[in-house]
Structures are given as structure tokens and as C-alpha cells.
């Protein structure tokens, strides 16, 4: 009786740990989905210089709250705080300081064992996604803290996306 109770209590951890490696194998090599190559983006956007010396400004505004950062007030209309990609609500995470219509969005859903988070680089002027980064994980609720945790295919997924965002259009 005790082992069954323990399994029922920890079922999401067991399922996430068992299923995630198979899902990781399915997604291996497919983490980055390219919609526009750097050359195509340059041609369509008219930007002929490198983005090497530009920065990505973190978007700190909470949905429904007025924006207070002068950078975001000045560039209002060049970005959208919320965008939908593949039916999922993505939140603005950063904006390029030189080309404020070039935005980064993220969708993180820790409420399902079969986690599939996405990060999108989007050109709001062209109304096109440049690329999408997929992060696969098995989410579960930590029994001690009650918070969401995961078994991720790539523990460095966020820094990998950040590096890709920084270097893709250089």
C-alpha cells in the first residue's frame, strides 16, 4: 500500500524522468527552427550592418501595468508586449536597442509533464519570425517546495537561446 501511495504522490516526477529522455531524442537537432536566414532578413529589413554592437534591452513591464522605462516609452508601437505563435501566448522578453522592432518573445508552460517551451526572435516591422528555439523538458511539482521543476533536455537552454539571439544576425 505504501509504495502505491508514494507512486501516486510522486507520479509526475517519475513520468517526467522516464519520458523526457525519449522526447529529447525526438527533438535532437531540431531545437532551432529558422524562418529567415541572416541574408534574407537583411534583404527584407534593409539593415546592412552587423548587429554585433547592439544590445538587447530586457522588458520588465508586468502585463497590464504602464510602462515606465524611457526606452520603451520612446519606442512604443515598435514592439508588442504579447504575441501568439502556434496558438501559445508569448511574452516580450527583450528588444534590440538599435532596431526596437526586433523583439524576443518567450513561452514557458510548467503546468504540464510534457513541457515544450519556445523562444522566438520576431521582426515586428516585417511581421515575420526570424527563428524559433525549442526547449523540451519534463515538468513536475517538487514535493518539498511545491514549485515547478523540470528535467530539461538541455540544462543550458536559456543561455543557448541568448547566445543564438546575440549572434544570429551578426
Please tell me what each predicted stretch does.
Residues 2-75:
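N-terminal export/targeting and maturation segments
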Residues 46-170:
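Mature extracytoplasmic/lumenal regions of exported proteins
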